[in-house]
């Protein structure tokens, strides 16, 4: 039975091999800019910025792009004034959805999100209508191939992780939000290749979806992620592997 973390892995693999690479760069640049705006441009003292830079480097973003994004965040270069917004929603099958965006126009963004929801069997929720179903966590992954689960789990816990879950293709490692970067560095110091370090809304419990609800849900999640302003979508579902693979 596959869950939302596996769906994210599938979407990342597709993004790396098709024309969505430009959209991925845009999201990473906005995250770097936002991190620098909120925590300053010194990556040494700004864990969120360090993580954003690492993620950008992992997909071969040019250094000039990274430097410009930082300077726009700190105000050294003129740029768009972004703000972070968070939306809560329901999808097919009663699935709870958290939608994080970075935007220069919240009015436009909320209208875009509402439109995608209404066109894909979803509904916008009110504040805290679904957020209480999630925990705010740091997450990262390590490819499962060639990795001993027990050794990784021991290394992850020593580095500050709360939990390690094997989703079949990778190990998903969870931490407290403030321990994300330290845990990542601890694992890298043990020669593990850590990918996709990020803050996420992790569901406390999951809802099983199947049949038409599953198909509609995957279509909705993809439609939301295609919005320019949307940075991340988290949801509390699980579904069978065959349906997930056809996503």
From Swiss-Prot:
Coiled coil: none
Paired cysteines (S-S): none
GO molecular function, one term: DNA binding
GO cellular component annotations of the record: cytosol
The keyword Disulfide bond is annotated on this UniProt entry: no
Record-linked InterPro entries: Integrase-like_N, TACO1_YebC-like_2nd/3rd_dom, TACO1_YebC_N, Transcrip_reg_TACO1-like, Transcrip_reg_TACO1-like_dom3, YebC-like
SUPFAM superfamilies: YebC-like
GO annotation, biological process: regulation of DNA-templated transcription
Keywords: Cytoplasm, DNA-binding, Transcription, Transcription regulation
Matches recorded under Pfam families: TACO1_YebC_N, Transcrip_reg
Cellular compartments annotated: Cytoplasm
Sequence similarity: Belongs to the TACO1 family.
Name under which the protein is recorded: Probable transcriptional regulatory protein GAU_0635
Source species of the chain: Gemmatimonas aurantiaca (strain DSM 14586 / JCM 11422 / NBRC 100505 / T-27)
């Amino acid at each position: 039975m596959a869950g939302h973390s596996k769906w994210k892995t599938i979407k990342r693999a597709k993004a790396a091999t098709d024309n969505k690479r430009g959209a991925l760069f845009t999201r990473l640049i906005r995250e770097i800019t936002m991190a620098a705006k909120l925590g300053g441009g010194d990556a040494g003292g700004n864990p969120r910025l360090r993580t954003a830079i690492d993620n950008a480097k992992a997909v071969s973003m040019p250094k000039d792009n990274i430097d410009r994004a930082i300077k726009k965040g700190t105000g050294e270069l003129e740029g768009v004034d972004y703000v972070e917004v968070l939306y809560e929603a329901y999808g097919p099958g009663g699935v709870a959805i958290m939608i994080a965006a970075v935007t220069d126009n919240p009015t436009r963004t909320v209208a875009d999100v509402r439109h995608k929801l209404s066109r894909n069997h979803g509904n916008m929720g009110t504040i805290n209508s679904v957020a209480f179903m999630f925990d705010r966590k740091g997450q990262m992954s390590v490819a499962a191939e060639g990795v001993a689960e027990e050794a990784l789990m021991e290394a992850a816990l020593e580095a500050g992780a709360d939990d390690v879950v094997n989703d079949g293709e990778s190990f998903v490692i969870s931490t407290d939000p403030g321990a994300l970067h330290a845990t990542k560095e601890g694992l890298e110091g043990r020669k593990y290749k850590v990918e996709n370090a990020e803050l996420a809304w992790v569901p406390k419990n999951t809802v099983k979806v199947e049949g038409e609800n599953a198909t509609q849900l995957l279509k909705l999640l993809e439609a939301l992620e295609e919005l320019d302003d949307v940075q991340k979508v988290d949801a509390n579902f699980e579904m069978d592997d065959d349906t997930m693979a056809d996503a």
